[in-house]
């Protein structure tokens, strides 16, 4: 039986850079030290994009941020941005800490999730990292110290601390042991141990300097204070006092200190406790527990509830225990004697033991790595000028000692905020969201009536690819998994590198798409009415706002034309098969979302009907979006099923790194409608079957080696299993390659990304030796090293959306193996090609400096042009063919050497080269006119075999016709003695 499935819609967009900071905000980079964002931008030389409003530069340096597990660590900062801004900025002052000024959209990690600066309130708590990373390379610092005339020893740094006689910026480039000596000197000289804290006069960057040791201090006007058990112990361990009285006072202070920082994360602890079977009464958590209390609570939660079995029995109705019934009712699990939705979900979690230490570890990491301080003041200011931003691999970084984040269209459709739901909110993977047709009708109802549209689809399945790189993972039988795509473009910023990359990928996969021109709300004077269709909202605007919108739309239309697309505003499109439809929207306020949904549904229905017809009962086929470990389930795969029906207990064949994996579905977990497949806990329904098109999490044994981007095929019979294995291995082997031929080594995060990178390289004629999925390893570097010995231009590694393992980084640096990593394919290849060109030019310059060019000269027959007969002989000559340079040896017609050209002169000027047709005077060392050389005689430049090979093999493009003639003439002379020259 065939039916129409819901279309799969991929949402692509460029990195959002409406979230920026003032130019004077500071960041710490181990390689550079403490710099302002403006200084960082100026240090980055390679321009990626530049226009009137913005400039993007490639950075590629390490910067402190927070990873997806909640750990403070060094992250790769890919780009630094500068954007023109006119309007409101938000200055956030943190109590006892620094302030930072950002655009209103810039989010902060708070005790209530990621919150935009414009929505922050006094009393909110925002995250401060417990440490920042500086330089630990002593050899590197020694060079810097030498340039600055500083001795790089602890004694000098201790004395500098006592007198503050050193540039403070140097301290962020100095290794920890020297910084420790500096701080010890400063605290010995100026520090006072009070009853509850250490106190010292404040200098500007002292709190950031202390963060290098995990010490969080407090700023009070012109004083800095260190208090709390954890901070005091870290101070004693890493800094301490040389002064014995102060050291003793510190020991006493620590012995009395019982508490460290307090953490306002009550709701997160309650959620975690409930997951492990604890009610709030059992845990009895105070409002803001201290670090010490929190650690005890987490240990208790990790051990699990001792009476979980009784609670399960109560929820299942097997026992009736009044006390438990009352408590579970208070927790919202039971209402009017029946299980609530939360109760049903939690019962499944408890029954299946879907929790383990990893859930606790995330919160523990947050507590170990971050401190939450209260917002003292939120101030709105007007600003005109450039604002700056940095793109890191997890889209967050530390500025002014505060964690800031860059983070959307699907959120508006879902009417949820995924980032706020995630405790860390720092993931950038593909997610899938099912939007039922009822929701589409609810959002776009008035428009559907107005347009007399009828939507027959069961719904829309959106796949959120936060970057174009994720789209390449959406593979289905060599094409794209997506039926349709939405390309999100900031109408104010226009095309970005990611936009261009996305267009190229959509073109390559032949995926039809519509354009969402986002952020119309930022057009000056735009009147906002939330969730209003664009066509109605546009009627509220004055002529100036409409004119600005039209100008920006025409700029976009012009850009699309450059890429070979006819485009127009959606309501002006005459033929949707020939023109791109652009829908002006505001994802933030929901304006235009109605038109976008109706357009997607209408186009899918009209033009993709045949593609959407599927055999419902047939075996399922799908594509892996992500492989991840889930508490209680082990390794799972997030899959988009695009054909057939998948059942619990079905045998499936999955693409693995080295082989096809055959396993049995143990559980199918389906996100609720409008929920996203990577949402946190309480999101999944356990189902017995799932029919295309749908996003589903599959739990099954042996999925550790499953490859993101590879196929999933249900195989009901042994014959079908073998057939599926063959098909999957064919697909993988067509992408993952390992050969002995000359070529570059490429790595990518998924099979689809690898395929896209391979295709681009092949189209450019760049050979590939090895293509594989995964991070760049030591083995990859060693292989590139062996290639380099044969052909240096291919002895490189190109990595797309992957990391470089530490040991690989060290060897590559030591051996000089170039590694190119990034998340824009065309930019990666451009970087590689630019490097090859630079290396070739460098090699050419080296060869040109060494090689001898061929030349033929004739001495003037007139004795008047003999200016000196010997020591050296100076004569007037004409260059007949080729060229001559000082240092070349001259030979006669019979091959006899006559001397070396010492210098070349034209009138009063000495020349480094003379070419065909030039008349010059040459000084010939070792020749006597009348004995060795004679007026009117022809002489030839003596070149070696190696010179001839170098010229013809490596420098052919710089040889002029005259050089080649000279080479042939000289070859004829030399061929009398050496047959090698006959071939020239």
UniProtKB/Swiss-Prot annotation:
The keyword Nucleus does not apply. Residues 391-608 form the tr-type G domain. GO terms for biological process: intein-mediated protein splicing; intron homing. GTP binds at residues 464-468, 518-521. Residues 94-215 form the DOD-type homing endonuclease domain. Disulfide bonds: none annotated. Pfam families: GTP_EFTU, GTP_EFTU_D2, GTP_EFTU_D4, IF-2, Intein_splicing, LAGLIDADG_3. SUPFAM superfamilies: Hedgehog/intein (Hint) domain, Homing endonucleases, Initiation factor IF2/eIF5b, domain 3, P-loop containing nucleoside triphosphate hydrolases, Translation proteins. Belongs to the TRAFAC class translation factor GTPase superfamily. Classic translation factor GTPase family. IF-2 subfamily. The intein interrupts the GTP-binding site. PANTHER family: EUKARYOTIC TRANSLATION INITIATION FACTOR 5B, TRANSLATION INITIATION FACTOR IF-2-RELATED. This is Probable translation initiation factor IF-2.
């Amino acid at each position: 039986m065939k039916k129409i499935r819901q279309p799969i819609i991929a949402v692509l967009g460029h990195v959002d850079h409406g979230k920026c900071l003032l130019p004077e905000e500071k960041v710490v980079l181990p390689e550079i030290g403490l710099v302002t964002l403006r200084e960082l931008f100026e240090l980055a030389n390679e321009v990626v994009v530049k226009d009137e409003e913005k400039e993007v530069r490639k950075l590629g340096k390490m910067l402190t941020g927070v990873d997806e597990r909640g750990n403070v660590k060094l992250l790769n900062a890919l780009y630094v941005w500068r954007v023109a801004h006119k309007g409101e900025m938000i200055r956030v002052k943190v109590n006892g800490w620094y302030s930072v000024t950002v655009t209103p959209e810039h989010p902060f990690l708070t005790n209530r999730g990621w919150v935009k600066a414009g929505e922050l309130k006094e009393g909110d708590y925002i995250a401060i990292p417990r440490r920042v990373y500086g330089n630990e390379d002593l050899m590197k610092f020694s060079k810097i110290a030498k340039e600055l005339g500083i001795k790089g020893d602890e004694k000098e740094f201790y004395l500098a601390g006592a007198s503050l006689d050193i540039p403070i910026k140097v301290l962020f480039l100095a290794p920890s042991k020297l910084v420790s000596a500096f701080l010890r000197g400063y605290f010995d000289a100026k520090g006072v141990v009070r009853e509850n804290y250490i106190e010292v006069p404040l200098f500007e960057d002292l709190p950031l300097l202390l963060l290098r040791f995990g010490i969080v201090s407090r700023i009070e006007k012109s004083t800095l204070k260190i208090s709390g058990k954890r901070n005091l112990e870290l101070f004693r361990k890493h800094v301490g006092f040389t002064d014995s009285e102060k050291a003793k006072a510190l020991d006493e202070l620590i012995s009395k200190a019982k508490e460290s920082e307090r953490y306002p994360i009550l709701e997160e602890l309650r959620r975690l406790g409930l997951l492990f079977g604890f009610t709030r009464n059992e845990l009895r958590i105070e409002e803001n527990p201290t670090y010490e209390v929190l650690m005890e609570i987490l240990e208790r939660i990790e051990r699990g509830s001792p009476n979980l079995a009784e609670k399960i029995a109560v929820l299942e109705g097997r026992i009736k225990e009044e006390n438990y019934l009352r408590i579970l009712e208070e927790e919202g699990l039971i209402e009017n004697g029946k299980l609530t939705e939360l109760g049903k979900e939690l019962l499944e979690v408890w029954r299946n033991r879907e929790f383990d230490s990893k859930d606790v570890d995330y919160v523990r990491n947050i507590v170990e790595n971050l401190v939450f301080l209260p917002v003292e003041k939120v101030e709105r200011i007007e600003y005109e000028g450039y604002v700056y931003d940095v793109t890191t691999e997890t889209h967050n970084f530390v500025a002014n000692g505060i964690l800031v984040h860059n983070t959307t269209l699907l959120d508006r459709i879902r009417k949820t905020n995924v980032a706020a739901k995630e405790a860390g909110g720092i993931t950038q993977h593909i997610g899938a969201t099912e939007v039922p047709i009822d929701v589409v009708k609810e959002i776009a109802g008035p428009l559907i009536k107005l347009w007399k549209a009828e939507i027959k689809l069961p719904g829309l399945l959106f796949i959120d690819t936060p970057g174009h790189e994720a789209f390449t993972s959406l593979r289905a039988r060599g094409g794209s998994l997506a039926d349709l795509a939405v390309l999100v473009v900031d109408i104010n910023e226009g095309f970005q590198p990611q936009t261009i990359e996305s267009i190229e990928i959509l073109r390559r996969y032949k995926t039809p798409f519509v354009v969402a021109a986002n952020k119309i709300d930022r057009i000056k004077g735009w009147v906002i009415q939330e969730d209003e269709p664009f066509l109605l909202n546009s009627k509220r605007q004055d002529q100036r706002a409409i004119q600005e919108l039209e100008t920006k739309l025409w700029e976009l239309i012009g850009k699309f034309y450059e890429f070979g697309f006819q485009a127009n505003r959606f309501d002006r499109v005459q033929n949707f098969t020939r023109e791109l439809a652009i829908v002006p929207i505001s994802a933030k306020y929901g304006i235009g979302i109605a038109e976008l949904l109706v357009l997607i549904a209408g186009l899918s229905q009209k033009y993709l009907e045949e593609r959407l017809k599927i055999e419902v009962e047939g075996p399922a086929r799908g594509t892996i979006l992500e492989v991840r470990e889930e508490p209680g389930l082990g390794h799972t795969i997030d899959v988009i099923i695009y054909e057939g029906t998948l059942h619990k207990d079905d045998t499936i064949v999955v693409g693995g790194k080295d082989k096809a994996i055959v396993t049995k579905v143990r559980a199918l977990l389906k996100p609720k409608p409008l929920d996203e497949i990577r949402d946190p806990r309480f999101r999944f329904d356990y189902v017995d079957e799932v029919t295309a098109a749908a996003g589903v999490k599959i739990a099954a044994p042996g999925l550790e080696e499953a490859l993101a981007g590879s196929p999933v095929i249900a195989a009901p019979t042994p014959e079908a299993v073998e057939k599926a294995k063959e098909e999957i291995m064919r697909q993988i082997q067509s992408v993952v390659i390992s050969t002995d031929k000359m070529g570059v080594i490429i790595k990518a995060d998924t099979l689809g990304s690898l395929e896209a990178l391979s295709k681009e390289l092949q189209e450019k004629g760049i050979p590939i030796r090895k293509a594989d999925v995964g991070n760049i390893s030591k083995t990859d570097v060693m292989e590139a090293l062996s290639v380099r010995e044969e052909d240096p231009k291919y002895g490189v590694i190109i990595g797309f959306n992957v990391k470089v393992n530490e040991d690989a980084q060290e060897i590559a640096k030591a051996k000089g193996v170039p590694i190119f990593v990034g998340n824009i394919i065309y930019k990666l290849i451009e970087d590689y090609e630019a490097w090859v060109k630079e290396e070739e030019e460098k090699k050419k310059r080296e060869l040109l400096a060494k090689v001898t060019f061929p030349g033929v000269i004739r001495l003037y027959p007139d004795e008047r042009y003999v200016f000196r007969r010997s020591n050296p002989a100076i004569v007037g000559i004409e260059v007949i063919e080729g060229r001559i340079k000082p240092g070349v040896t001259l030979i006669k017609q019979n091959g006899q050497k006559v001397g070396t050209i010492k210098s070349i002169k034209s009138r009063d000027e000495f020349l480094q080269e003379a070419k065909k047709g030039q008349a010059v005077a040459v000084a010939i060392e070792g020749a006597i006119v009348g004995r060795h050389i004679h007026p009117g005689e022809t002489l030839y430049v003596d070149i070696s075999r190696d010179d001839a090979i170098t010229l013809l093999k490596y420098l052919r493009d710089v040889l002029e016709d005259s050089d080649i003639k000279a080479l042939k003439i000289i070859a004829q002379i030399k061929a009398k003695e050496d047959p090698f020259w006959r071939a020239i």
